[in-house]
Curated annotation (Swiss-Prot):
One of its GO terms (cellular component) is cytosol. The keyword Thylakoid does not apply. Component of the heterotrimeric retromer cargo-selective complex (CSC) which is believed to associate with variable sorting nexins to form functionally distinct retromer complex variants. It is a peripheral membrane protein. Belongs to the VPS26 family. Its main location: cytoplasm. This is Vacuolar protein sorting-associated protein 26B-B. Keywords: Cytoplasm, Endosome, Membrane, Protein transport, Transport.
Amino acid sequence: MSFFGFGPAAELDIALTDGESRRRVEHKTEDGKKEKYFLFYDGETVSGRVTVSLRNPGKRLEHQGLKIEFIGQIELYYDRGNHHEFVSLVKDLARPGELSQSQSFDFEFTHVEKPYESYTGQNVKLRYFLRATLSRRLNDVAKEMDIVVYTLSTYPELNSSIKMEVGIEDCLHIEFEYNKSKYHLKDVIVGKIYFLLVRIKIKHMEIDIIKRETTGTGPNVYHENDTIAKYEIMDGAPVRGESIPIRLFLAGYELTPTMRDINKKFSVRYYLNLVLIDEEERRYFKQQEIVLWRKGDIVRKSMSHQAAIASQRFEGTSHPETRPQHSGAAALEQEHE
């Protein structure tokens, strides 16, 4: 309600040119909820229309100009006063003057660079948005519209498997192997665990997917670890020579691509955490970083078929006893209270 003439004398609305046909995707908001936003990719044009609707048609509205901005910005939650803009484009839509009726203004930002993927995390948010502003002497009228940006990658040229022998001296030696070190977000992790020596009573084994978000620089660095998935490999005691297969489907989890040193503000990395628990509830673990990437939506074989092919290839490899042994074994770390 306008009081003594103060308050918004007009409303702004932003509509995209291809809003009827453009794909929408769910994206997590700062409060943890999911909402749908229009999806864009790097290099795509962003165009549309800003409509100024007068609250009192027929009554003239003075203004100091109308503009539209396209902004990409990073906000660190511990430094909320500062917004770090890495993309900032502006177009003037109307010169200072008067409006006597509601009016629409077209805009176009051609082939816009959108270098990073949209991200909402524990301590940081990277967002892209359009902001229309009608400048007035007392109170500006503004309207924002968020969009989501995905960054696509091509298949990595080098994607070697991960093989490592780990253990506790004279107590436990295992070899774990994952078929790749880089996985797309709908991929399947195929692997196996091979027990070379078992002299302690293991009662449970699992693989966790851990997301590690790092924000800030220098003394102001914050780390947040989030366990995205827990995959039980084994429930019960293993024996020497036993081989346990792993098939972990990534499509069911809330994952993002790996992000490294984004605008020198934050990173998001993913780790496979192999966890063993003995009968005395002692926990041993070994972490291995993997790289996650997003590929375009193309026609592909079903996930189950994809997993079957990968596991057939994988299970066709020889056992560790028939392969050259590794030069050394890494130690399993014990988790302390």
